[in-house]
Structures are given as C-alpha cells and as structure tokens.
Amino acid sequence: MALEYPPHLRYVDTHEYIRVEDDIAVIGITAYAVDQLGDIVFVGLPEEGTEIEKGESFGSVESVKAVEDLYAPVSGKVVAVNKAVVDSPESIADDPYGDGWLIKVRMTNPEDLDDTMSAEAYASLVEGS
C-alpha cells in the first residue's frame, strides 16, 4: 500500500508534518513515520503553555520497535495537546493527518515554514528517488 502525503501540508526531514491554520501550526507525524515505527504504544507530549523551539525535541513516540524523539518544525507556544492520542497512542496510525495530530502551536516565527518541504519533496526524500 502506498503511503500518502497530503499536498496541503508541509513536511520536515524528521518526519513531522505541519498543517497551517492562520497562526497555528498543527503538528503530527507522517504516515512514513507511523509505518516505520510499527505499533505505537506511548506518546509523550508537552503541556499546554509550553514554549517549544524549532529543531528541538518536544516529546517522544514509543513503539514496539523503537523510541523516537519528536522535533519541533516551528517555534511557538503549545496551545493544544491531543489527549486522545496520549490516552490511545495506537490511534495515530488510523488517521495520522486528521484525528492523529499531536500538538497545536501558536507560531512565534512563521518564517520557520520556509524550511519545510512540499509533499512531493518529502515523498522523494523518504522514497529515495
């Protein structure tokens, strides 16, 4: 089954995606990351109000295969945390780009998005073409 990378999202090479809603960045992990991790058993996320910095770890995802850090694609303040995925981490795999989002961040520097990739560029990265 081919993995999907919706064209309206932005991507980073650490396998997070960004859905931009005005000055809010909705951040999650890509279908590629979900596929590589396998069964996700734990998600550690920051609390609302936490300041995160672009390029720095803001949490982790644990699967039966590995524990991977989550890296912030943008800087800002966490304004929402998806408690549903904290309570049921395996649900991320069902809809990584929809209900499986991780955090929402009010961006302090929207120019951070300049360093993100299109769906096409991200697909080329992960598919090695």
Swiss-Prot record:
PROSITE patterns recorded for this chain?
BIOTINYL_LIPOYL, LIPOYL
Note how many cofactor molecules are bound and how: Binds 1 lipoyl cofactor covalently.
Cell membrane among the record's keywords?
A: no
SUPFAM superfamilies the record matches: Single hybrid motif
N6-lipoyllysine carried by residues: K65
Q: What GO cellular-component annotations does this UniProt entry give? A: cytosol; glycine cleavage complex
Q: Which Pfam families match?
A: GCV_H
Q: Does the keyword Endoplasmic reticulum apply?
A: no
Give the cofactors, semicolon-separated. Answer: (R)-lipoate
* Subunit and interaction comment: The glycine cleavage system is composed of four proteins: P, T, L and H.
Stated role:
The glycine cleavage system catalyzes the degradation of glycine. The H protein shuttles the methylamine group of glycine from the P protein to the T protein.
**Protein name, as recorded:** Glycine cleavage system H protein
What organism is recorded for this protein?
Synechococcus sp. (strain JA-3-3Ab) (Cyanobacteria bacterium Yellowstone A-Prime)
Taxonomic classification: Bacteria, Bacillati, Cyanobacteriota, Cyanophyceae, Synechococcales
**Could you tell me the gene encoding this protein?**
gcvH
